[in-house]
């Protein structure tokens, strides 16, 4: 996916999240942030999603991956 489409997707997800906080939307936005190289924002969204569902395996995996990427930078 190109950067412009990723940015548009993040903007639309942000609108939806602002309307109604949702773990799946937070996780999806975190994935876009990670893909765009915005590891800090990806971590924030993972943390927010994990507050809603602390045992969600995919989000835990993404959070751990993003933490590793942050420490590699």
Functional labels for PLM-detected ranges:
Residues 1-73:
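Alpha-helical tetratricopeptide repeat
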